[in-house]
UniProtKB/Swiss-Prot annotation:
Entry keyword set: Chaperone, Cytoplasm, RNA-binding
Organism placement in taxonomy: Bacteria, Pseudomonadati, Pseudomonadota, Gammaproteobacteria, Pasteurellales
Protein name: RNA chaperone ProQ
Biological process terms in GO annotation: post-transcriptional regulation of gene expression
GO cellular component: cytosol
Chain residue ranges for the region called Disordered: 115-138
Role played: RNA chaperone with significant RNA binding, RNA strand exchange and RNA duplexing activities.
GO molecular function, one term: RNA strand annealing activity
Biased composition (Basic residues): 117-131
Keyword Ribosomal protein: no
Family assignment from sequence similarity: Belongs to the ProQ family.
Length: 197
């Protein structure tokens, strides 16, 4: 009885598989280490009996891994290349460091262009409305405090709510507050310091 092996189809799944199989060489999080020159051949030999990955898929996954920003960040002066087992396999030369820096700069520029285009498209979809300059400037509220001892049921007062004052009618006078009914029908308890004439 033979079990069917599930083939890995996308590059991301293949990279995850490589990171599981060769954890000292491939990393999924953090800074990636520069890979040994000719690592593809080593990988092809190590995985030749593995039915999950074809050479073409392996090449595509390796291309994606080495063009990732994390990998390009790791390719800096003095960085040491690693083989499949994580052993040192030579230091990056200046030419490769410069190439990685150029690739990273180009990738960032493409990303910035794409982001700017998406932002522009979003703005076209939902343009910002200009401020209405015809709105009246509201003057500061000039409210005079009401003598709480003079308030009785039926008195018309103003209730301060934030920066606004609403007209209200006193429904009940309590010890240090009053129950009022706003013009919209809402009944609420209001502290004496929030009532004005």
């Amino acid at each position: 009885m033979q079990t069917e092996v599930q083939k890995l189809t996308n590059a991301k799944a293949i990279i995850t598989y490589l990171a599981e199989k060769f954890p000292l060489c491939f990393v999924l999080e953090g800074e990636a280490k520069p890979l040994k020159i000719g690592l593809f051949q080593d990988l092809a030999e190590a995985l030749q009996d593995d039915e999950r990955v074809s050479k073409t898929q392996l090449r595509q996954a390796l291309r994606q891994y080495t063009s990732n920003w994390r990998y390009l960040y790791g390719c800096r002066e003095g960085a040491v290349r690693v083989d499949l087992q994580g052993n040192p396999a030579g230091v990056l030369d200046a030419e490769h460091v410069a190439h990685a820096a150029q690739q990273l700069a180009e990738a960032k520029a493409r990303f910035a262009e794409k982001r700017a285009a998406a932002k522009k498209a979003q703005q076209k979809k939902h343009p910002r409305k200009p401020a209405n300059k015809n709105l009246k400037k509201e003057s500061k509220l000039s409210l005079s405090a009401v003598d709480f001892s003079q308030i009785s049921v039926g008195s018309v007062v103003k209730v301060k709510a934030g920066d606004n004052a609403k007209k209200a009618t006193v429904v009940e006078v309590l010890k240090d507050s009053a129950r009022v009914e706003l013009e919209n029908g809402l009944i609420m308890n209001v502290a004496a310091d929030r009532l004005f004439a």
